[in-house]
Amino acid sequence: MTESKNSFNAKQTLEVGDKSYDYFALSAVKGMEKLPYSLKVLGENLLRTEDGANITADHINAIANWDPSAEPSIEIQFTPARVLMQDFTGVPCVVDLATMREAVKTLGGDPDKVNPLNPAEMVIDHSVIIEAFGSTLALAKNVEIEYERNEERYQFLRWGSKAFSNFRVVPPGTGIVHQVNIENLARVVFDNNGLAYPDTCIGTDSHTTMENGLGILGWGVGGIEAEAAMLGQPVSMLIPRVVGFKLTGEIPAGVTATDVVLTITEMLREHGVVQKFVEFYGNGVKSIPLANRATIGNMSPEFGSTCAIFPIDEETVKYMHLTGRSEEQVALVEAYAKAQGMWLEQDAPEAEYSEYLELDLSTVVPSIAGPKRPQDRILLTEAKEQFRKDLPDYCSAEPVDESLPAKRMDSEGAVQKEGEDVAGYNSSRAGHGESAAEGAAGRQSNPVVVSSPNGGEYTLDHGMVAIASITSCTNTSNPSVMIGAGLIARKAAAKGLKAKPWVKTICAPGSQVVDGYYKRADLWKDLEALGFYLSGFGCTTCIGNSGPLPEEISAAINENDLTATAVLSGNRNFEGRISPDVKMNYLVSPIMVIAYAIAGTMDFDFETQPLGQDIDGNDVFLKDIWPSTEEIEETIAGAISRELYEADYADVFKGDEQWQNLPTPEGKTFDWDEKSTYIRKAPYFDGMTMEPAPVSDIKGARVLAKLGDSVTTDHISPASSIKPGTPAAQYLDENGVARNDYNSLGSRRGNHEVMMRGTFANIRLQNQLVDIAGGYTRDFTKNGEQAFIFDACQNYKAAGIPLVVIAGKEYGTGSSRDWAAKGTNLLGVKAVITESFERIHRSNLIGMGVIPLQFPAGESHASLGLDGTETFDIEGIEELNNGVTPKTVHVTATKESGDQVEFDAVVRIDTPGEADYYRNGGILQYVLRNMINA
């Protein structure tokens, strides 16, 4: 760490018990005491890293004199204390770092300089896929398959953990990165050789903001930005606007943390908080348990803010003690926060904010969200009605004719294979005439009778719940909703209720602690009675690793075009994300996952319809089995303790026997295997010189894709399974990979050849240039014929034709995945023109040398009459060669008729630092050149 110039004489001593720490006191700078908590953290960061060049006294004064009403205009350099990664985004980071070592050597530099300067930690959580479920064998089987598929990736990561200093890997099977972070990795306050400072952390996953619940300032970034931060490059940002979100009242009985966070998500997305900090304050904060705060922080990317932070208070240190942090660490956090004015005092004057919102927690009611966006909140009491309103958008709208018999699937070949019970087939799930078409009058219906391999039959229909998954760090980190799920399962099982036989039931907690307290509370037997067996420790359903549905169910859905649904306790429900067989996805609490598994359909009113009958034939309603707040709290008190966390995290980096026995390559540089379909040397530095080439205007570009609103990074670079016949599958076929070994696109992010072919390949992508969903476009080198996007890009590249993408609002929402920008770059796209961008993806595009542009205010591709067949010329980019970032560039779109549409597009290069990245062809090239010149 570079020694601070300490212009304000802020370095002081803090006594905590019998230990002394140095720290940079905010009280040394007038004005800092009035700032919101989040800006105090930024202020300390600048004080501590002041070098007189990139970070000066003027920057420190600028934040101390922050004007809440001003629009962001002052650039600062933020230096995070650490970097957090998961394996899907982390593998390409390590690939890039390994490639950079070779590039530095080639350009005459010292390859040993390519090393993380601050702690960088990775948790392997994105690779486990739920192939097996509904059995005690499910966990072992899924782990076995995970290692078989990912051995090469895991060997590479083990090499990285030895080859790079300051880089540690939490092995697979431990939990989900954000849950492991808040339960173990997060420091809250760092002790770096006697220097105390706030724990700040950026991560290669957008839900890194879960740590905001602990008072840790941080957010998700693309992998390329994380790599730069690891190598000492500060994060360039503007001092943001801060939205103060006042919480009052208390959460009422029967309302879960999930209900609260969905309400907040709806409010903030409607308000508009992109590029802003959100900070929670008010008397209601003290009543919110830390786990609930973490759940709220986790959803920050879903409402679009940079962070969603809670200050440090008594609840913070209480949670740190519970989760096994040392008494010395807990004492430091409390003393430091109080010394810096970062401790939440209930009677302290409120900070001034840029904008204000308020929520009385007592007004929150049970809710779900869907069918395709987290902000689309639905009152539980209106869920059936809303489902029926949305259904016509997903299936043909013929009226129901209940006199017609249900179709019957041919059961030939539906024979149970040896060991198939681990995939969810067991006698209790055989089917005994249950029907998802019951009560279908008034909605679209297409009943299909399916025979179970175990005997019996059942009827599927639109709205059937195909997947019910207790998943994701968002909720599995929260004991109240997880214990609640176990208790509702206990009550349901006692009354003889079961999940419907067509529901794939999954329980995949975010840490082993959940398994521990379920065992202590003896809840597993109750969950298992409803089909919810332990399936894995990882992200699973939430990122699309739901695994295949049973063959006969998948066939019935696809052959009859049924609109299947999924319910999950996750944070994202974007189209095509959860399963290729599922069209409508709903976010619900873990408790409601159980309820919907029993109901078996989204076409269900929990107030008026019984879930079933008990052994005496009495109707059982949701209210009859809903656990009380007292029951949940009593169970938590008896099942959860500090010792549980201490035992599970005693040696978090060690891993199981399989991990320890993996053969691991040696050496400072990696020995690339050109035949590998998982790990390939990155192409970003090929042909790179020490002097960057001048940037140039874009001439004669064609439109690769014309897209609508809310295009997600899932649409751009899906992480899901690889569909046979697509360019990515063709590449794997050509390289001898069997279809059942395709794995997922996310698992192959270390191979750019696969990822290029998977870019814009989401099965639900709606490219308005063509009339079919998926990764298709029109190839204007072939007279505009329909083609796979990758194939068309190869033809454009051969012809020397640059490409542009045009889109609507909220382009790039969702995951932080930098492959959405990397793939865009490698396909030959030079500019993306939209109505608005989501924060992380805009930054990632610049980091990969793609210029983000916005249509003039109030304009869109539709209002300008652009249909995507035009040829685009973009003038004014070359001003960047003169050290000037133009406010706008001139765009001329020439139609096939010769008519022209002209407009001035807003350049979304927002900071001088971003301009430097773009001039260098990307952030990694910029960092590499600076590293060699240092």
Swiss-Prot record:
Record field: catalytic activity: citrate = D-threo-isocitrate; (2S,3R)-3-hydroxybutane-1,2,3-tricarboxylate = 2-methyl-cis-aconitate + H2O
Swiss-Prot/TrEMBL cofactor(s): [4Fe-4S] cluster
Record-linked CDD domains: AcnA_IRP_Swivel (cd01580)
Disulfide bonds: none
Single GO MF annotation: mRNA binding
Pathway: Carbohydrate metabolism; tricarboxylic acid cycle; isocitrate from oxaloacetate: step 2/2; Organic acid metabolism; propanoate degradation
Pfam families xrefs: Aconitase, Aconitase_C
EC number(s) from the headed UniProt entry: 4.2.1.3, 4.2.1.99
Biological processes annotated in GO: propionate metabolic process, methylcitrate cycle; tricarboxylic acid cycle
InterPro entries reported for this sequence: AcnA_IRP_Swivel, Acnase/IPM_dHydase_lsu_aba_1/3, Acoase/IPM_deHydtase_lsu_aba, Aconitase/3IPM_dehydase_swvl, Aconitase/IRP2, Aconitase_4Fe-4S_BS, Aconitase_4Fe-4S_dom, AconitaseA/IPMdHydase_ssu_swvl
Entry annotated with the keyword Metal-binding: yes
Entry-linked NCBIfam families: aconitase_1, PRK09277.1, PRK12881.1
Entry similarity comment: Belongs to the aconitase/IPM isomerase family.
Quaternary context: Monomer.
Function description: Involved in the catabolism of short chain fatty acids (SCFA) via the tricarboxylic acid (TCA)(acetyl degradation route) and probably via the 2-methylcitrate cycle I (propionate degradation route). Catalyzes the reversible isomerization of citrate to isocitrate via cis-aconitate. Could catalyze the hydration of 2-methyl-cis-aconitate to yield (2R,3S)-2-methylisocitrate. The apo form of AcnA functions as a RNA-binding regulatory protein.
Protein name stated in the entry: Aconitate hydratase A
Organism: Corynebacterium diphtheriae (strain ATCC 700971 / NCTC 13129 / Biotype gravis)
Gene for this chain: acn
